[in-house]
Amino acid sequence: MDEKDLKIIEILMRDGRKSYTDIARELGTSESSIRKRVKKLEEEGVIKGYTAIIDPSKIGYNVVALTGFDTEPDKFLNVAKELCKFPEVKKVFTSTGDHMIMTEIWAKDGKEFSDLIFNKIGKIEGIKKICPAIILEQMK
């Protein structure tokens, strides 16, 4: 991977819909060169896919929470896998720091979020502590 690949990645991270022609023009190279480089980055797993960035509130999700989970050590991976099964859990990360597992959870409202945490997720075997932090405003 060279400097040009890194610039292509940076451009696609800003706008995943940007055409190869526009990227080539911006970097002063040919469209076919960009096409080959992007294909190689995809094959190597550097580019894993393309997605839309959604404003949860515009589609009815008024509660977004970053939620930390502490687990029994021997249940750690099982808890992470179980969390992945919930459609409301949009992202699951294993981490160091304050919590063993961090998630991003979307809910329609506080009642739905509470029900999810206490009556569904909270019943996963091995969870010792749940620490939700509701997002007030996304700055970036």
Swiss-Prot record:
Domain HTH asnC-type stretches: 1-62
Residues of the signal peptide: none
Keywords: Activator, DNA-binding, Repressor, Transcription, Transcription regulation
KW Membrane (keyword) present: no
Entries under Gene3D superfamilies matching the protein: 3.30.70.920, Winged helix-like DNA-binding domain superfamily/Winged helix DNA-binding domain (1.10.10.10)
Transmembrane residue ranges: none
InterPro entries xref list: ArsR-like_HTH, AsnC-type_HTH_dom, Dimeric_a/b-barrel, Tscrpt_reg_AsnC-like, Tscrpt_reg_AsnC/Lrp_C, Tscrpt_reg_HTH_AsnC-type_CS, WH-like_DNA-bd_sf, WH_DNA-bd_sf
DNA-binding residues (ranges): 20-39
Keyword DNA-binding belongs to the record: yes
GO terms for MF: sequence-specific DNA binding
Quaternary organization: Homotetramer.
Function: Participates in positive as well as negative regulation of transcription. Binds to its own promoter.
Record's protein name: HTH-type transcriptional regulator Ptr2
Organism this protein belongs to: Methanocaldococcus jannaschii (strain ATCC 43067 / DSM 2661 / JAL-1 / JCM 10045 / NBRC 100440) (Methanococcus jannaschii)
Gene symbol of the encoding locus: ptr2
